[in-house]
Amino acid sequence: MPEPYYSMYRKEDVVLDKSFFTPLEGKPDHFRTISKMWGMWEASEDHWKEVITKFWGYITLIEDDNLVYLHDLTSTVFDLANQKVPESFEGQSVLPIMRQHQDNQRKGVLGQLAGHFVYFEQRMWRRKDYKLVFNATDVCELYNIRNDPEEMHNLFYDPQYNRIKKEMLEEMRAEMKRLNDPLENWVYRIIDEI
C-alpha cells in the first residue's frame, strides 16, 4: 500500500472486539482446525492491529442496512447498462439502494459453505436482528446481533429463543428452496427436530 495511505491510520487507535480475545468459545470445533491451518493465532495482537490499520482505507464508512447478495452485482451491471435484467437472474439491482437510498425489503440473506476445508455443510440465515448458523454435523448458532454484535453468546439451545429459532429456520429453508439449494430437502426433514 503506497504512502500517504500506509501511514494514514495508527495501530494504537485500533480497539479490538471482545470476540478477538475469546474467538472460539461456543463455536463449532472446526473453527479451531481452520485457525490452526491458517495460523490465525500465531500472530500477535500488535500484528493484527497493524493489519487492520493498513486495510482501514478500504472501508468507506457509508452505512446502509439493506441486505444484499453477491449475485445482486450481475443484475446491477445490467441495470447500469440500461439493459433489462433477465428473469432468470436471482439477484436484484442495488442501484435503487445506492442512488435513491431505497429499502430493498429483504428480510434476510442466505450464506453457504459447502464443505471447503471443513467436514460438514454450513448455512447461515442473516436478518437485521438475528443471525442463525446451521452446521450440519456440529453445534448450530443463533445470535442477537443487535444486542450481541460480536456474537459472543450462542442462543441456539436456549429455550427462550425457540420461537425465533424456528422462525429463522423456516425462513432459511424457504430461501434455500428458492435458490435450489440441495441441502434444503435435508433441512426440511429435520427442521422440527433441532
From Swiss-Prot:
Q: Which InterPro entries match?
A: Alkaline_phosphatase_core_sf, GAG-degrading_sulfatase, SGSH_C
Do you know which SUPFAM superfamilies this protein is assigned to?
A: Alkaline phosphatase-like (SSF53649)
Instruction: Extract the PANTHER family matched here.
Output: ARYLSULFATASE K
This chain belongs to which protein, by name? Answer: Uncharacterized protein HI_1316
